[in-house]
Structures are given as structure tokens and as C-alpha cells.
Amino acid sequence: MNREADFLQQLGQDRLIASIKSPKNLEQFLETEIQAAFLLTGNISVIKRYVDLLKQHNRTVFLHVEKIPGISYDREGLKFLAKFVKPTGIVTTKSSLINYAKQEGLVAIQRLFLVDTDAVAQGLKTVQDIKPDALELMPGLIPEMIEKVV
């Protein structure tokens, strides 16, 4: 199975993904049964250590690229992540990074902010054009908007 299929199967079993925003949250996460995490903390000097720790505990790890200082938001930044840090994938608001991530074998999750009807329309167009592996819809508590995307 490939990374995307593994992730989707896991998501079907455990519908929660933790959002780790500080090193303290990292330790708290490891005490839970949740299997997947979005990592929004760290920097280029510690991020591999964080990812390795999570993977040692058999967790699925996605890096929010824009939240990791020192990682460039381009093809070379994604190559670095894929070759040296080795997360399961990335989360990004930047559509340009989705294809780069997929080319490097990373699962690519597009984060969309659905704040008004224009954002919904633009988000749907982006998803059709870019074809990310999965979507994170923000704000998180918007069930009526989910029907429009699905």
C-alpha cells in the first residue's frame, strides 16, 4: 500500500487528527490513542527529531510547512523534508506546494479557509485544479460547508 492509501485507511478508523502546537503538546499527544498529528511547532534544527520521535511511536506525521521556520516554501524545501525529515506528508495553504509534495512521495493535504462564499468558490476551483490527497477545512466546525465540498 502507498502512503496515501495507508493514511486514508487509518483516517477511516480514527477520525481524529491532533494539532501539535508546542513541544509540550508533543508529549501530551504521545499519551493519547490518536494515531495522526499535524505538527505546527519546531524549526529546521529540531523538526527531524520531532518527526522521528512520533514515528518511533508508530504515529502518522504531517508537517504544516508554513509553521516550521527555516523550511522554504518551494520545491527544494519539499525535497529536503521528503529526503531528510521523512514525515508522512504535509499540510499547507499554498496550492503550489501540493504537486511538489506529491512528486516527492509525500501525502499532500490542502488547508482551506472557508470564510465566505467567495472563499468556498475559490477553494473548490483550487481543489479541482490541484487535486490534493485530502483537505483540511477551516474553521473546523463547519458541517454545513462540508456538504458543499463533498
Predicted feature residues:
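Active-site-adjacent beta->alpha loops and helix N-cap segments on the catalytic face
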Residues: T41-H57, G70-R75, T92-L106, V115-G123, ...
